[in-house]
Structure formats: structure tokens, C-alpha cells
């Protein structure tokens, strides 16, 4: 009896010791995580830029219905961001399929505005997709695209966003593309001027990623509220099979040169990321070099995290990009 009792007592003691050690380990890890988060927050105060989150970083959980796009402000706040960059295609189907699209648009905007206020977030810009080709050589189609973008200018004004991001798809001949793009941008920027909204062109593939041509377009438009949104990674000029997306890139504009040439017209900046090495560095983009270009241009606004990788979860990729921006920014 005594021997059995001693064995039971010994087993109980070992179990208690194990639980105690695990508890201590978790407590230390939690404290370490909290300290790291606090240090990151403190370090952000000394940066030359603020951090925003591009909603596209969450496209996978949104498309798989794991995340309601209406909860974007809450998720961005949880991840430690201050600003929001919305992607309109996440709301377009709901709006377009409604019995009264105009009324549904207002419901969506009211919801987004309420959420941003609830979580103390700043609405920065709307990324517009699927509203027509602004660089089309067909004047009727081009003007219709301008008209279709105007509702999002109104939406940006209502939400308090400073800009909308547009694409310049359409013509494939450089001279035709420049003339068509400049025409559409002038018309849209003129409308947006009265709404206190900027029209920003992102390098988003093909001729819009040929930054020499894009700069010419900016000079042709020559309006204060028409500018650029440099993206660290979107410099593909041509893909296999002539595809717009997905296919392998076979020709690319020099990315650092491209960002440097876009910065004089920049009113927002997008920090694209894909994969990271063991030290947390982006594997194909030198973030310190990119941030130096941005800082040297005198930019002090928001930099938006836009993670597009597949090797880690969206949350992990977003935080890795955010941490890299903070780390690289502190070194400048």
C-alpha cells in the first residue's frame, strides 16, 4: 500500500511540475510577445511614415468567405495599423446585384464609415477595379469608364479618403495609350477636384508599368490632384501568352528606378511583398533601398502593406511585411 501510495504521489508531483513549467513557458512567451508588440509600436513613432493596410492582403480569407469585407477596419486595427486602403471589387457584387444598387452602395458606405470610426481608423483610399478601361482608344468606351469611376470618387469623398487608385488598361500602342490615358485622367481629375479627391495611377502591369511612359502621362495631365501610387513590385511589362495576370513575367521594368521616377507624383505608396528569408527580409525586394528612395523624395505619408505571397498565411505575411517596414525604416 505504501509503495503504491508513494508511486501515485510521485506521479502527481511530476504532473504538477509539468503543468507549472508549461504555464511558466507560456507566460514568458506571452510576455515576450507583448513586449515585442510594444517595442514595435514605440519604434513606429520615430518612423518617417505611417502604416496602412491594403485590403487586397486579405483577399484569400475574403474570397473564401472566412472574412466579411465589412470587418476590414476591425481586422486592420487588430493587426496594428492606422490607415485603411479599400478594394472596391470586394463590395461590387453585393452592390450591383441589389434591387437598388445606389441604395445598397450607401448602406455599404455607411457600414464602412461606422466601422472605421468605431476602431479609430483613417480611411485613405479606394482601389478601383472593373469599371472600364480608362486608356481605351474607343472614345465612347473611355468616356463611359470615366463616368463609371465617378461614383467611387463620390464614395471616397463620403468616407473621407484622400484618393482613389485607378488602372490604365486599354490601348497597347504607347502613343495611343498616352493620349487616351491623359484624356481620361483629365476628365476624371476635373470631376474629383470638386470632391477634394485625388486620382492616383498605380503601376499595375503592361504600359502602366513602363514608368517613362507613365511620367509622360502625368506631365500631359498636369493637375495637382492627379498623381501616382508607386507599388514596390508591379513592374511586369509582358507575361507569357500575353496574359494580363497569373502567367509568368517575361519582361520587367527596373523596380528601384521605377519607384524613384514615380515618387515626385506620389500621394500614396504600396509596399508589395511575396516571400521572406530566415532573417525576415523580402526575397526579391530590398526594402531598405526602397524606403530610402521614398524618404529621399520627401514623402512622409502612409505606406500600405500589400502582401501577395502563398508560402505563409495572410496574417503572417502582413505582420512580416509590417515588421520589415518598421525595421528598415528605423535604419534610415
Where are the regions that the model predicts?
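A short helix->loop->beta-strand "cap" motif at the edges of active sites that frequently abuts
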Residues: 121, 197, 297-301
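Active-site clefts of carbohydrate-active enzymes
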Residues: 266-279, 300-314
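N-terminal pre-domain/capping segments
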Residues: 2, 21-158, 163, 176-179, ...
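Active-site groove signature of glycoside hydrolases
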Residues: 155-176, 195-207
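Positively charged n-region of N-terminal signal peptides that target proteins for export
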Residues: 1-8
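Bacterial N-terminal signal peptides
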Residues: 11-20
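Acidic/histidine-rich catalytic cores of soluble enzymes
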Residues: 46-47, 182-292
Amino acid at each position: 500500500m505504501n509503495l503504491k501510495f508513494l508511486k501515485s504521489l510521485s506521479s502527481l508531483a511530476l504532473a504538477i511540475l509539468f503543468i507549472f513549467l508549461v504555464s511558466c513557458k507560456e507566460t514568458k512567451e506571452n510576455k515576450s510577445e507583448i513586449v515585442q508588440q510594444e517595442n514595435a509600436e514605440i519604434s513606429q513613432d520615430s518612423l518617417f511614415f505611417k502604416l496602412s493596410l491594403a485590403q487586397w492582403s486579405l483577399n484569400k480569407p475574403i474570397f473564401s468567405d472566412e472574412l466579411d469585407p465589412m470587418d476590414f477596419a476591425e481586422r486592420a486595427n487588430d493587426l496594428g495599423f492606422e490607415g485603411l486602403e479599400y478594394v472596391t471589387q470586394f463590395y461590387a457584387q453585393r452592390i450591383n446585384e441589389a434591387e437598388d444598387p445606389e441604395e445598397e452602395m450607401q448602406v455599404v458606405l455607411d457600414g464602412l464609415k461606422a466601422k472605421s470610426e468605431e476602431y479609430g481608423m483613417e480611411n485613405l483610399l479606394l482601389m478601383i477595379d472593373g469599371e472600364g478601361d480608362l486608356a481605351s482608344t474607343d472614345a465612347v468606351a473611355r468616356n463611359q469608364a470615366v463616368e463609371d469611376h465617378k461614383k467611387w470618387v463620390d464614395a471616397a469623398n463620403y468616407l473621407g479618403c484622400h484618393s482613389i487608385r485607378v488602372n490604365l488598361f486599354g490601348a497597347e500602342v504607347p502613343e495611343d495609350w498616352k493620349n487616351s490615358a491623359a484624356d481620361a485622367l483629365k476628365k476624371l481629375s476635373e470631376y474629383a477636384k470638386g470632391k477634394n479627391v485625388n486620382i492616383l495611377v498605380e503601376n499595375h502591369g503592361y504600359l502602366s508599368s513602363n514608368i517613362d511612359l507613365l511620367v509622360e502621362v502625368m506631365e500631359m495631365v498636369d493637375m495637382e490632384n492627379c498623381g501616382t501610387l508607386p507599388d514596390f513590385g508591379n513592374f511586369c511589362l509582358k507575361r507569357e501568352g500575353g496574359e494580363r495576370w497569373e502567367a509568368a513575367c517575361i519582361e520587367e521594368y527596373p523596380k528601384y528606378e521605377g519607384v524613384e521616377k514615380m515618387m515626385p507624383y506620389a500621394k500614396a505608396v504600396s509596399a508589395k511583398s511575396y516571400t521572406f528569408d530566415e532573417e525576415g527580409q523580402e526575397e526579391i525586394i530590398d526594402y531598405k533601398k526602397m524606403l530610402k528612395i521614398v524618404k529621399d523624395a520627401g514623402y512622409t505619408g502612409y505606406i500600405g502593406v500589400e502582401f501577395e505571397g502563398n508560402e505563409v498565411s495572410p496574417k503572417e505575411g502582413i505582420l512580416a511585411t509590417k515588421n520589415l517596414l518598421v525595421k528598415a525604416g528605423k535604419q534610415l
